[in-house]
Amino acid sequence: MTTVDTILAAKYPAKAHALRVSESLKARHGGAGVIYLEAQKTRLIEDSDEDMPFRQRRPFFYLTGCLLPDAAVVYDAVKDELTLFIPPINPESVIWSGLPLSPEEAAKLYDVDRVLFTTDVNSTLASIASSHNGQTAAFAIAEQVSEGTSFQGFAETNTTSLKTAIEETRVIKDAYEVALLRKANDISTKAHVAAIHASKTATNERQIEAAIIGACIANGCREQSYHPIVAGGEGGATLHYVRNDVDLVDPVTKQRKNNVLIDAGGEYQTYCADITRVIPLNGRFAPETRQIYEIVLQMQTECIAMLKEGVCWDDVHALAHRIAIRGLLKLGILRGSEDELFEKRVSVAFFPHGLGHYLGMDTHDTGGNPNYEDKDTMFRYLRVRANLPAGSVVTVEPGIYFCRFIIDPILKAPETGKYIDTEVLERYWSVGGVRIEDNIHITKDGSENLTTAPKSIEEVESLAL
């Protein structure tokens, strides 16, 4: 067994998470008597008798490690006692779906003190309130409490603070969570390699997407962290491209497109990988793509080298822009001085998004405190506005894009158009976009890259040939 598999052979650390959330609530509110959370409900597709695809509620999973629908959990913070509630057996459901998990089986699977049926929720809450002499508060999430659930007997029912406490606690991952993220990355790396192999003969983006999803499922990620992006040629200039069904042969030139941008990651036990690579469709990168790729790889390499506990994410993002400016100046796409281009925010036309985001149970994980109202366009879409704590996991995903919709207004504005050489720029529209994205675990003195998907030009071309 690998180190990751050894760690994951243990139970998901639900009680440790419950304690951390309780301590967060205590720091803000003087203590939590009880925490109550519900799993996602079984829901039907509109106008159908088919179940909707199931996605577990993240707050519930964080305190249970349980993927069952229609369940609940209660944490008695005074006794440090975690109780999981699972649905009772429905004889009619057994006919179609088989026997559900029993309380005894659930107790062996999950890091909880006891397992009861959901029919016992109210009596359990009442018993806890009584044992606390009505002196403690109950915490829940307002929109995630079923009708009929009663918090009678508690001094207060707070439905506003728990969500924030969980989201802030989730920023710092424990060793088990890092192992889950590493596992998701390992499987997703296999998917990206499968995508490179598929690209050799693929005639349409969807064939590459199929290879990604198939490799993820075959290796243990039944779900994708997000809708995969498979963008050939100029499609790579669209940040969240969703078509994935365009032919890879240019309809005008009848030539195979130069490259394809792939942004895809599998979800393993609710934990996400988020990886982006650009691969050549003709075995080797076209000269213009190669030049942009080298700049983006340098942006990522230098930004990752800067990472450690306490680093300001704004500063890392700014470094990425400066490296982009230097590279585009060298190619002749930009003209002027580095400082002037930086101050005028000209590079935002080519690198319009943030450098990355927290990663965990959500692709854009909680706790980043972005400011989408920021008047500074360089930082408006930065999803993390903080000094990075040790234990956090971030994506580092610089990119350079040639999107006419974004660049044209900059070209037409007299105060910024003078900084771009349109004749040189014309050679790069076919590149579309280059983004390189890895998942980085922040440590006290540096960082650890969880992503092993090939990314050097030599590695990628050797697989693509």
UniProtKB/Swiss-Prot annotation:
Coiled coil: none annotated. SUPFAM superfamilies: Creatinase/aminopeptidase (SSF55920), Creatinase/prolidase N-terminal domain (SSF53092). The keyword Membrane does not apply. Its EC number is 3.4.11.9. Mn(2+) 1 binds at residues 274, 397, 437. InterPro entries: Aminopep_P_N (IPR007865), Creatin/AminoP/Spt16_N (IPR029149), Creatinase/aminopeptidase-like (IPR036005), Pept_M24 (IPR000994), X-Pro_dipept-like (IPR052433). It comes from the Eukaryota. It catalyses: Release of any N-terminal amino acid, including proline, that is linked to proline, even from a dipeptide or tripeptide. GO terms for molecular function: manganese ion binding; metalloaminopeptidase activity. Binds 2 manganese ions per subunit. Its cofactor is Mn(2+). One of its GO terms (biological process) is proteolysis. SMART domains: AMP_N (SM01011). Mn(2+) 2 binds at residues 263, 274, 437. Keywords: Aminopeptidase, Hydrolase, Manganese, Metal-binding, Metalloprotease, Protease. PANTHER family: XAA-PRO AMINOPEPTIDASE 3, XAA-PRO DIPEPTIDASE. Belongs to the peptidase M24B family. Catalyzes the removal of a penultimate prolyl residue from the N-termini of peptides. This is Probable Xaa-Pro aminopeptidase pepP.
